[in-house]
Amino acid sequence: MLDTVHKPLLDIRDLTVEFATRRGTVTAVRNIDISVNKGETLGIVGESGSGKSVTSFAVMRILDRAGRIADGSVTFSGIDLRTASDHDMADMRGREMSMIFQNPRAALNPIRKVGHQIEDVLLRHVQAVRANVREKAIDILRQVRIARPEERYHAYPFELSGGMCQRIVIAIALACKPQLLIADEPTTGLDVTTQKAVMELVLELTHQRGMSTVLITHDLGLAAAYCDRVVVMQKGEVVETAPSATIFKTPAHSYTRKLMRATPRPGATLRDLLEEGRPAPAAASVQSDGRPLLKIDNLVKEYPRQGITKTMAQFFGRKAPATTEQPFRAVDGISFEIMRGQSVGLVGESGCGKSTTSMMAMRLLDPTSGSIILDGEDIGAIPARAFAKLPARKRIQMVFQDPTDSLNPRFTAMRAITDPILRLGDVRGGDALRARCEELAQLVGLPRHLLDRFPHQLSGGQKARVGIARAIALHPELVILDEPTAALDVSVQAIVLNLLDELKARLGMSYLFVSHDLHVVRLLCDYVIVMKNGRIVEEGSAEQVLEAPQDEYTRELIAAIPHPPV
């Protein structure tokens, strides 16, 4: 039972946070009140720009130099954090309050062993001495369920999966047993089973230690599944606060209802995700001629388990070391077809081989064996570098996972969209190129005035539209979508999914949709393929696989998806 009689552990009152910019002062958080009780798990939900992360940075006193707390109070365990000295705050961070950041790889030092990074925190806060710090670090790795902790102690971040890196960040955050843990989007980019394992691990450890947790997320399903109370933020203000059991069943604010509507859930259609009053996508369909557009036959991709590949050795002018170990099979003899106008979902956990498969189908990666047949031509036999210059490249395009990372920061939106046209198209600059770019922008719903902006001047949804416009610029027959909505807010995701569905119908394209989110796959795909350890374990129509799964692994994926009460 929550401690509601005593004062809250964290008490935020009338907090206002401002940032100084070239265009004047921007208020990121305005007069908010939030409290966290001892032992409570509080969720703060909202879209990008709502102020939820800025609030957490203000609590930790790690605001950007341009930011400042303009008004209000932040009290932690009876201490006024606004007036605390920098030395006292540095001492409290890690020992009394700690934070899990959104990107685990960015939060870790890439050139320092993970075990040493845990030791740094223990030694900084005098939780260990040199004589026993290694033993304590290994014990903490064991607590966060890192397999073979003695071995992983010596690993660098790049040698670990995303899920393992997140566990290391959790280990560092909980090493000194703080009273308060702030988790800022701790599962973004993780597959559903890893997400479930990470969240259950965090809550298990915090409950064991009687800690309070603040979960910052845009995933309402996550908040519903793991939080006692939920705070909803919009444009820097708190618009609703209520117990999680209440807020999702009877949301009082229109913005909360909008977020609920946009969240994929069992039984929902693409149209259901849009705001009321928005026009429905085109209902046109494409008839297949019976021949597969893309046929994958017994496709295999192998990597050496140690040393360097022959290709790398040739590139660096070295001799590849001999190894007696069997190579690792990332993709192990899979076969499937994509018909014209069809959307095929390729799902599975991280490391299952789905992205490797999509990269080979896109001809960005050469297969070890097997065939990739595009409309009767075996393009798998053509080296990836050579294929990039062939006319057939125009027929297959890709929308990448992260709309920010996939755009050149030095290119304007127009330059990014027209890049494939300049490389492989028949329009060469001038007014014709601008007209074609504006046509594509209109097609994906990107306002013309944004074409001359750079990626950092665009929102996540706008960058996603640029990526889609670039992918369809050459009128491809097949578009490979690699987790295209994983990093987007739910309302933006809903719009992008409907846009993709409309474009497929209008332009007659086929999709290979790579994802770990089965709710999203069900909305967009006709056929679903489930991969595990490089092999296909189940496939069939979307309704068949997702409503009546035959394989235990598929059932585990479906069960791991958190979603708000229907």
Protein language model features and the residues they cover:
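Conserved catalytic motifs of ABC-family nucleotide-binding domains
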Residues: 177, 475
